[in-house]
C-alpha cells in the first residue's frame, strides 16, 4: 500500500509545547494544499494520513471537499485532530463528506484535563464531537492519549470511557529522538516504503520528520520537485530521490540517525 502523511494547511489554534510550531527557529510555508495537488496525491497513493506536523487538517478551507474527493477515488484516510475551534455544524459537514474516514481524536488525559498539554483545547467539547461522530455518523473513531505525568493515573478510566463509547483507545509514550548513551541500529523506515511525508511548501519528503530538517536535504525541496510543478511518480522516481536513498547507505543525514534508530537486540 502506498501511503502519505499530509500537512495540508498551516493553521492550528493550539499551543502544544512539543509541536514544531512553538520552535521560532522553524520556518514553514503559510499555504494550503491546492485541489490540483490533492488530485495528484489521490491518483498515486492508496492511503492518506491527515496528520499535520504544524497544522490541524480541519482548518483547511476546503477540507470537506478533500474528504469527498478521497472517497470518490477509493483512497482510505485517517484524520488526526486535536483542535476544538470549529462549530459543531462544520464537524457534521466533514463527517458527512466521507463516512469511511477514520478519525483520531487527540485528547491527552480525561477530557477536562487535556488542555494542560493541548493548550487552548476544549477537551470536553472535542469528546462530545467524538461521541457525535460515533453515535450519529457511525464513524470509525480512535481516542489517542499521549501519556504525561499529569494524566498517567487516569489512563484506565479513560480507556473505560472509550470502551463505553465504542471507540478504540490508543496510548502513546512520547519521546523526541533517542538516548545518545545507548547503541542503536540504523533502520530508516522510508526504505521499506512505509510512508512518505509532506510539507506545507508542497514538497513530498521521505518522512514527516524531514519537514523540520529541510536544511539537511536541500536537493529534495527544489521547485521542480514540488507537487505544484510535478506529479508524484516523477518526484519519487527522480534522480534526487534516488540519490537520497543511496546516501542513506553511506552518509545519512544526522536527523535520520536520530529518528530512525532502534535499540540493538530489542524485541
Residue ranges and their predicted role:
Residues 1-102, 113-124, 128, 136, ...:
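Conserved alpha-helical substructure of the radical SAM core
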Residues 6, 10-13, 184, 250-253:
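Processing junctions and N-termini across compartments
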Residues 7, 44-52, 76-80, 99-109, ...:
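Conserved C-terminal portion of the radical SAM core fold
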Residues 12, 16-19, 190, 207-208, ...:
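Short cysteine clusters
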Residues 15, 27-28, 58-60, 111-115, ...:
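Short catalytic/ligand-binding loop motif for oxyanion handling, primarily in non-cytosolic enzymes
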Residues 16, 23, 194, 211-212, ...:
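Extracellular/secretory pathway and lumenal proteins
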Residues 66, 74-80, 92, 103, ...:
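Catalytic cores of transferase enzymes with a strong primary signal for eukaryotic protein kinases
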Residues 128-140, 160, 164-180, 203, ...:
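C-terminal accessory region of radical SAM enzymes
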Amino acid at each position: 500500500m502506498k501511503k502519505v502523511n499530509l500537512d495540508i494547511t498551516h493553521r492550528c489554534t493550539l499551543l502544544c509545547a512539543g509541536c514544531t510550531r512553538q520552535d521560532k527557529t522553524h520556518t514553514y510555508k503559510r499555504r494550503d494544499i491546492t485541489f490540483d495537488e490533492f488530485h495528484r496525491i489521490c491518483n498515486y497513493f492508496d492511503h492518506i494520513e491527515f496528520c499535520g506536523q504544524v497544522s490541524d487538517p480541519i482548518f483547511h478551507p476546503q477540507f470537506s471537499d478533500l474528504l469527498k474527493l478521497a472517497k470518490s477515488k477509493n483512497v482510505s484516510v485517517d484524520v488526526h485532530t486535536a483542535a476544538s475551534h470549529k462549530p459543531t455544524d462544520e464537524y457534521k459537514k466533514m463527517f458527512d463528506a466521507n463516512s469511511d474516514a477514520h478519525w483520531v481524536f487527540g485528547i491527552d488525559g480525561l477530557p477536562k484535563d487535556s488542555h494542560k498539554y493541548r493548550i487552548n483545547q476544549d477537551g470536553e467539547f472535542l469528546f462530545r464531537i467524538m461521541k457525535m461522530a460515533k453515535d450519529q455518523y457511525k464513524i470509525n473513531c480512535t481516542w489517542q492519549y499521549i501519556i504525561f505525568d499529569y494524566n498517567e493515573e487516569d489512563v484506565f478510566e479513560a480507556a473505560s470511557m472509550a470502551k463505553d463509547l465504542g471507540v478504540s483507545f490508543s496510548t502513546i509514550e512520547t519521546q523526541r529522538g533517542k538516548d545518545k548513551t545507548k547503541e542503536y541500529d540504523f533502520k530508516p523506515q522510508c526504505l521499506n516504503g512505509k510512508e512518505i511525508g509532506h510539507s506545507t511548501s508542497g514538497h513530498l519528503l521521505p518522512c514527516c520528520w524531514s519537514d523540520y530538517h529541510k536544511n539537511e536535504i536541500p536537493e529534495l525541496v527544489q521547485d521542480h520537485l514540488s507537487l505544484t510543478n510535478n506529479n508524484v511518480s516523477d518526484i519519487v522516481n527522480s534522480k534526487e530521490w534516488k540519490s537520497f536513498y543511496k546516501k542513506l547507505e553511506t552518509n545519512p543525514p544526522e536527523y535520520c540517525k536520530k529518528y530512525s534508530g532502534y535499540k540493538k537486540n530489542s524485541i
